[in-house]
Amino acid sequence: MAAEDTPEWEDDAQPAARSSDSSGPHLWLVPTPVGNLGDITYRAVEVLRDADAVACEDTRRTGALLQRLGLRRPLVRLDAHTMYRAPQVLEQYPRLAYVSDAGTPGISDPGAELLREALSRDIPAEVLPGATAFVPALVLSGLPTARFTFEGFLPRSGRERRERLGTIAARPEPTALYESPHRLHATLLDLAEACTPARPASVSRELSKRYEETRRGTLAELAEYFAQGVRGEIVVVVGGRTEAEAEDTAPDWDSVTAELAVQGLSTRDLRSALMQRGLSKNDAYALALKHRADR
């Protein structure tokens, strides 16, 4: 590495010390390990140690983590059901650290709502770098990673789930998503139907733990492999749509739109129907307007 390319790191203790020396209100979003306690950072420990209190989704889980780290701080439950208490908690504990059950807060958890509340009150906020599950899973998938989309958790059922599956199927870049063990098999089957059974994908579970596993294959192969169930936290990565796949499966959208338009659908319903079939939002809207105008 050339001298001019050398990273300009600050001293390990400086970022935490800079914030901790301030006496004013402050919110820290602190990543916690997704499985291996050794993944906690020095800075995360310092912030947890110096905060007035630690807000979290599960006080028992976070209490066990703090005990392992040798820390004793007041714990406040702030999850999806108790986030209405955020204004009160921010006032009671001006220097507040927030952790999720695992990984980086603010992604697929209530931390984002707490952050918005703090920002609305002009409270300075920091997000510490640290552990997350979908980035290691994305890299381990072996799929191209220059561009990707993170979906979080899919809707469990209904039109919104179908629309999201159609959007995933149409993307040229890989998609990473979280799934629970008891829904994994059904989701893999739905993805195989939406994306074609031959679409490459991977399933990673128990990342950073003793029984970590990443299984790669087609969606059909993965659905068969995990048909008997699985345990652990799961990340699914689905490969992007290839040009050849797009050419083989691309429908005649004008014909599809014309068939739907004769049913008397409104422009909004027509657009929604096209999106359910995998067309992008902008293209669906343009076709819906065109066919409504032709009638």
Where are these regions (language model features)?
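A contiguous loop/helix-start segment that scaffolds small-molecule binding in enzyme catalytic cores
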Residues: 2-17, 24, 95, 174, ...
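Short amphipathic alpha-helix with an adjacent loop that forms part of the alpha/beta core around
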Residues: 16, 85-92, 167, 226-227
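Conserved helicase motor
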Residues: 76-84, 154-158
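Glycine-rich, flexible N-terminal cofactor/catalytic loop recognition
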Residues: 2-81
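General beta-strand structural signal in soluble alpha/beta enzymes
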Residues: 56, 127-130, 177, 203
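Generic beta-sheet signal
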Residues: 26-30, 92-100, 148, 173-177, ...
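Class I SAM-dependent methyltransferase SAM-binding "motif I" and its flanking Rossmann-like core
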Residues: 113-171
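Short active-site oxyanion
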Residues: 48-54, 122-126, 174-175
